[in-house]
Amino acid sequence: MRPVCTVVVDGLPSESTSSSYPGPVSVSDMSLLHALGPVQTWLGQELEKCGIDAMIYSRYILSLLLHDSYDYDLQEQENDILSWEKGAYKKWGRSKKKCSDLTLEEMKKQAAVQCLRSASDESSGIETLVEELCCRLKDLQSEQEEKIHKKLEGSPSPEEELSPTAKDQVEMYYEAFPPLSEKPVCLQEIMTVWNKSKPCSYSSSSSSSTVPPASTDTSSPKDCNSESEAVRERSSVASVPMHEKAQSRSRHEKESKLSSSTIEEKPAFYKRQIRHKPEGKTRPRSWSSGSSEAGSSSSGNQGELKASMKYVKVRHKAREIRNRKGRNGQNRHSLKHCGKAERGVHAGSGGSSSSSSNGSIRQLCKRGKRPAKETGRSDSGNTAVKDLYVDSRNNKEYKEEPLWYTEPIAEYFVPLSRKSKLETTYRNREDTSTLTAEAVEDLSDSVRGLCISNSNIHRTYLAAGTFIDGHFVEMPAVINEDIDLAGTSLCSLPEDNKYLDDIHLSELTHFYEVDIDQSMLDPGASETMQGESRILNMIRQKSKENTDFEAECCIVLDGMELQGERAIWTDSTSSVGAEGFFLQDLGNLAQFWECCSSSSGDADGESFGGDSPVRLSPILDSTMLSSHILAGNQEPFSNINEGSGINSCFSVFEVQCSNSVLPFSFETLNLGSEHADSSANMLGKTQSRLLIWTKNSAFEENEHCSNLSTRTCSPWSHSEEARSDNETLNIQFEESTQFTAEDINYVVPRVSSDFVDEELLDFLQDETCQQNSRTLGEIPTLVFKKRSKLESVCGIQLEQKAESKNFETTHACSESSPHGDGYSSGVIKDIWTKMVGRSSVAAVETERTGEELFSTDVNNYCCCLDTEAKMEALQEPSRAVQRSEYHLWEGQKENMEKRAFVSSELSKVDGGDYTTPSKPWDVAQDKENTFILGGVYGELKTFNSDGEWAVVPPGHTKGSLLQCAASDVVTIAGTDVFMTPGNSFAPGHRQLWKPFVSFEQSDMPKRGENGVNKGFSFIFHEDLLGACSNFQVEDPGLEYSLSSFDLSNPFSQVLHVECSFEPEGIASFSPSFKPKSILCSDSDSEVFHPRICGVERTQYRAIRISPRTHFRPISASELSPGGGSESEFESEKDEASVPIPSHVDVFEDPQADLKPLEEDAEKEGHYYGKLELESGKFLPRLKKSGMEKSAQTSLDSQEEATGILPKQNQCLECNFNESLEINLESSAANCKIMTQCEEEMSEFCSCKAGCQFPACEDNPVSSGQLEEFPVLNTDVQEVTRNQEKQSWWEKALYSPLFPTSECEECYTNAKGENGIEECPDAKETPSREERLLDFNRVSSVYEARCTGERGSETKPNGLHRKMCSSASSDTGDTGSEAGGEWVGPSREELFSRTHL
C-alpha cells in the first residue's frame, strides 16, 4: 500500500505538474522509490554522523529533493505579504522574479541544507552532503528514466501492466476507503487535490463552479472540497468570500446532486477536457468534484486557465472560478456585480448568481459544458440566470468576508476594469443591462461601497464602503444602473501603480480608522496595484483609468482627476473645467460632507459613495454614486463626463484636495464632473484621502482629522499629495495636509437616497456646466456673473466688484492650480452647493492660489470655464445638491433647488466667490477667498507665494443668514484666519484667530508650488437656507425636508462649522488641530450617528470643531447676517471693509484669537473629551475666566477694529446691546438666571438659548436657561425678551432682512427647538418659533453638541464665536458688553450655526 500511497502523494503531484500522464509518472516514481533504498540507507548513515536523526530527516530530505513540484504561488503570496508588511508594495511580478531567481533544484537544495542545518549543531559538511545526495538521486533518476524508456519502447512489461495507473490507484484507494460523505467521489476532484495542479484545476474548478463566489449561496467548489484543497486553491478561496464557505455546504449538497449526473459524464469529459479543454466541460466536472478537478482535468483546464490568465493571474483562482462560472454562462452581468475579479473575466461571473439555486447551478453546469465561446454568447441571453443572481444577491447582501483579507490573494486578478477581487467579492453588483459590465465593474472597483441601481432600479450596494489606503470607508453608493456607464471609467480609478509602489503602509496607517483588516491593505486587495492593497489600489487608482471613467457613473468624481484639475464643478459643457474645478486635487477630494444623512443610507456613507466609501470616498455620506442621484437619471454619469453631475451628485461633503478641502454635495459632484476621468483621477490620481468617516478614528487625536462632515463626521482631511488615500481623506491631512490631484482617488459624497436622480443629474448638469471651470488659470479668465459660492450657498449675493473679475475658480483648488497640496475648496463648494441649493458656495480651504477655492456655487460660477454654462446652471439650480446631502430638497428637489438658486440670484457673482486670487475682484479682496465649507461661508486666503487672496465680492442681497454669513468671510491666510464682516474685503479682514500652531507650508505643495500647504482653520457657517432663503418654494407643500431649513427663516440651515486644515506636519504635532465633528450627537461616541433633527429633517451633523480645530468663532455681527437689509449689509460690508484692517490687528495675538476657542473647548470639553482638550494646545488657555476675557477682548477688539462689524454692525451691536440690556432687565426681573440668559438670548437668543441650556455653565444660562427657564417660568418675560430681541434684532440685523416676527420666530424657534422650555416663547412668537423650531430641531442637535462643547458658553455664543472669531466665542460671557455687537449677527449666524 505504501507504493500506492507514495504514488498518490508524490506521484499525483508530479502527475498534476506533468499533466495528463498519471500512469507513467506514477510508474517512474514508484520505480524510483523502490530504488531509493540504498540511497536512503546511505543518507541515514551520513546524517547520523552529523548527529541528525536519520529516521526523520533522511525521508524528509529525500522527499524534499525528489518532490518536483514547488508552490510558487504560495511563495509569491508569502513574499508579497511579507513585502506588503514591510511596506514595499511589490508587484506580483517582482516576487515571481525573486522566486524564480533560483532554479527549482537550487531551491530544493537550499531547503534541504537549511533543514539539516537547523537540525544539526554542525553546519560544516551539510552542503557537501546535500550535493552528494543530489548527485546520487540524479543518477538514480537517470537510471530509472532509462529503464522506463526501455519499457515504454518495448511492449508494456507485465510489471508495468500490473502497476496501477494513478487513476486506478485512486479508485482502488477509495474502494478500500470509501468517502464518509454521501457525495459521490469524483476521481478528477481527488486527482486535482492530490495533484496540486493549481492553475488548471483551479481554473477548471472555477470555470466549472457555476456558483459565483460571492453571489451564490453555495461556496465555490473548492470550498466544497477539503480545507487542504482550499489551501491549495487558497487564491480562489481568498477571493471567495467567507459566506461562500458557508454556502459550501449547500453547494456540497448541490454538488452531490450534480455530481451524480456530472460524475457519470466525467470520464468522457475528463478525456475531452484534456483534448479540448472546454471550460464548460470542465465545469460540470468541477461542479461535481467541487472546486478541484482531476489532475488530468486540471491539465485540461490549463488551456482554460491560460485564457483566464489573460484576465486573471493564476493566483486568482477563485476569481477564475467565478469568471469561468460567468463564462459558464450567464453571468457576465453577474460578474459585474460579483466583483472586479469576475468583472476581469470578460464572461464574468454572470452564472454566479444563478448558481445560488440548484436549478441555476445545473444550468450553469450545462452551460459549462458548452464551449467558452458558447457560454460567452449565452451570457447576454442569461437573463434568467441574471435574475437568479440578482435574487441571490438581493437575498444575501454580500458582506465583507475575512477570507478576502486573511486568505492570501495569490495573483490578484487585475481585470480590465481593474476591479479588485476584494471589491468583486465584497459586493456583487446586480446585472445592469443599462450599465455595461465593465462600467459597473469599474464602478464597483472604484467604489466598493457603491450601490449600483439597475435600470430596474435594483440598487446594489457594492460595498458597505470603499477601502482607501487601508481604510474601509463605509459609504453605500447607490448607482442608478440606468445611468450609462461608459467603460470602466466609472470607478476604476486610474490605479497609479507608481503611487502604490511608492506608498508604504506606514503612510496608510491612519486609514485604519475604518477598522479595515490589515489584509485589506494587503497587496492582494488591490488588483490593479499589484504590490498594493486593493484598497490602496482603489484609492490610488490614478488618472490612467480616470479617463475611462468619464462616461462611467463614477460619481466618485471619476472626472475629478481630469488633468489633475478640479473636475468637481466641471460643467457638462466644459469637461476640463469640471475636472479641474472639481478639485484641484481630486486626491484632495478626500472628504465630503455626507450631508444627505437620512435620505440615503447609502448616501450617508461618509465619503464618496454614500455610507460606504464609494470610489470617491468614505466615502461616507458623500456617496459618489447616490442611488437617487444616479437612479433618476443616467445623466449623472454622462454628467460626470460633462462635469455637470458632479456638483449635484455630491451631497454636501467635503472634498479634500491636496490643496483644498471642498465640501461637495455629492449631487454636485455627481458624475456630472465633466470628466468622469477627472473624478477618477481625483480618486485615483492621488491617494484619495477619503477619510471615510466610518470611524471616529477620523477624530482620533493621532488621526489629526478634523471631522467636519456636517452629516458624517467626515473629517476635513488635508493630506499631502503623497498621502495615502485615507490621509487624503483625513481632513487634517495628517501627514500631508495637501492633496495632489493624484492624491484624491475617491471622493464619495453622500447623496440622500431621496434625492431624485434626475434632480441630481439636473443639478449636477447645471452645476457642472457652470463648473466647467478649468484649472485655476482658466477660471481667472472667466468672469462669472453667476452667484458667488457664498451667494449660492447663502443665497447671499456677494457684491461682485466687477464681472470683469475673472474668477479663477480654483476648481476646488483645481488640480492644475499650483498648490495641489493646498486645500482645494471643492469640498466646500459641494457642501455649499448642496446647502444653498445650487449655490453651493463651498469655500475651499485655500491653497495659496485660490485654486483650492473654486466657486462653490456650482451654478453660480462653478469655477467652470464656461461662464455661460455656469450662469445657466446657476439659474437652474440642480436639485441634487441640497437634497442629496441633507435631503433638504426631498420635497421639491429639483424645483426647489432651482428656485433656490434662481431665487437667490444673489450668487450671480462674476466668478466663483472664492476661487481666484481676488484679482478679478476688487483690489481689497484680491488676496482673500471666501469659501463655504460644509455650508459654512468662509473667506479663505489663498496663499500664493505672493499672498493673493481670493475673495468673494460682497453679495448683492442677503436673503438669509448665510447671506449675512457671506458678509462675514473667514479668510484663512497662511497662518491666520481672517473674518471679513459684511463681506468686507481685504482691508476689513479681521484675523479671526491665528493658528495655535503656525501653519507650516506643507512640503507637498506639488500642486501649489507657492501654495501654502498650511493647515487652515476656518469657521464655516453653513446656511442650508443659503440661497434657499431667497428662493421661494414654488409648491408651498414642497418645503425642505428640514423644517429648520426654512426658506423664510434666514437662520435655518446655518451650520456652524469650525474646522482646521492642517498639513500633515502640523497634524502630527498639533493634537489641537484635530477638529471634532459633532454629528448631531451629544457625545463623541455618537459622532458617527448623525442625529436626525425633526422628522422630515435631513440629518445634519453639526460639526463643532473644538478649539483643537483652531477655529476661531466668527461673530454673528461679523457675519452681519441681518445687516438689516441687503443695502445695509452691503454698506455694512463696505464699512467693515474699511475698518477691518484694525480687526486683523486685533487678533495679531494668535493666542487671543484662540482664547474664545479655548473657552469653547472648555465648555465643549465633554464633547471632545478631556483628553483631547488636555492634549490640545488650547487647554492651558481653556479657562472660563480666560475665555471670557478673551471673548470680551475679542469683542472689544472687534468693536475697536470696527472692521469686524461695519458701522451697521456697530449699530447693530448697540441695538443688540440695548436690546440685550432691555432683555436682561426684563429677564432679570423675571429670572435671575435669566439675566445671563438674556444676555445670551439677546445675543444669540433662539438658537443658543435652545441648544445652550444643556451647556449653560456660565453664560449658557443666559441664553439657554433664560429662554428655557424663563419661558417655563415667565412666558411673558420670554415674550418680552422676544419682543425686545425682535426690536434689536430688527434694528441690528434683521429689521431690514427679516421682519421682527421672523427674528422673533427664529429666536423662539431656537429656544423651542433647543429647549422644550422655550416653547412658551415659541407660542408667543409662533411664526418665528416654527421656523426656529425647525431650525432648532436641527440646530438643537448641533447646538446640543455645541452646547456640550461650549459648556458654559451659551451655545449661541459658541456658535457665534465660531462664526465670529473672537467676539462670538465670548458672546455668552460678554453678551451684554460685546454681545450687543455680536448679538444680532451672532444670533442669526449663531442660530444658523447652532442650527447646523
Curated annotation (Swiss-Prot):
Transmembrane regions listed in the UniProt entry: none
Keyword ATP-binding appears in the UniProt entry: yes
Keywords from the UniProt entry: ATP-binding, Nucleotide-binding, Phosphoprotein
Biased composition (Low complexity): 198-221, 286-300, 1365-1376
Region (Disordered): 146-165, 198-388, 1113-1137, 1347-1396
Alphabetical list of Pfam families matching this protein: DUF4603
Positions with biased composition (Basic and acidic residues): 242-268, 1386-1396
Residues that bear Phosphoserine: 817, 1083, 1197, 1339
Annotated Basic residues bias: 312-327
Ligand binding (ATP): 88-95
MF terms in GO: ATP binding
PANTHER family per the UniProt record, alphabetical: DNA SEGMENT, CHR 5, ERATO DOI 579, EXPRESSED
Full protein name: Uncharacterized protein KIAA0232
Organism: Mus musculus
Lineage, broadest ranks: Eukaryota, Metazoa, Chordata, Craniata, Vertebrata
